Regions:
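Secondary-structure boundary/capping residues
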Residues: 22, 34, 66-69
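Short, low-complexity N-terminal intrinsically disordered segments enriched in polar/charged residues
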Residues: 1-32
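A short gly/proline-enriched turn/hairpin at secondary-structure junctions
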Residues: 34-48
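A beta-strand edge to alpha-helix "cap/lid" segment located at domain peripheries
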Residues: 54, 58-127
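Residue-level preference for long, well-ordered alpha-helices that form the structural scaffold
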Residues: 2, 6, 49, 102-103
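Short hydrophobic alpha-helical module
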Residues: 16, 32-35, 60-63
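Hydrophobic pocket/interface hotspot
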Residues: 13, 25, 33, 49, ...
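Generic recognition of short, well-ordered alpha-helical interface segments
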Residues: 8, 20, 48, 52-55
Length: 127
């Protein structure tokens, strides 16, 4: 995969995420995609395969009234992209961890994408 192809694929994935369009997100993913959310050095969520990713992504929609991931930086090398992410969201419901509906979340982090067969093979969201 070339750098422009990787960037376009990630931009399409992020657009789907920002629009709550799970179908758009899935169209960018390899069938064996692995997703990990990593916070403070610990894996807090992991999905294996497109079906598990779809289930998690669909469930996550109800948690937000608005959400946006914006690409701040992009570095590509050998089928791997490191992307600096600026994240903004407003919660739609009270969360089990005590975060209340209407809470504004603003974070910066990094996402690492790998690619296989012209699709995203893995995503690590690191905050």
């Amino acid at each position: 995969m070339t750098e422009p192809q990787a960037r376009e694929l990630i931009e399409n994935y992020l657009e789907g995420y920002n629009l709550f369009d799970v179908g758009c997100m899935l169209s960018c993913l390899h069938p064996a995609v692995v997703f990990e959310n990593i916070a403070d050095g610990s894996v807090t969520l992991r999905t294996d395969g497109k079906a598990a990713f779809e289930a998690q992504a669909t469930q996550a929609i109800e948690f937000f009234m608005e959400r946006n991931q914006h690409m701040q930086s992009f570095h590509f090398e050998a089928d791997r992209a490191e992307v600096g992410i600026e994240y903004f969201a407003i919660t739609a419901i009270d969360w089990p961890n005590g975060i209340k509906a209407g809470t504004i979340l603003q974070l910066t982090g990094q996402s690492i994408f790998t690619f296989r067969d012209g699709l995203i093979a893995s995503i690590q969201d690191i905050s």
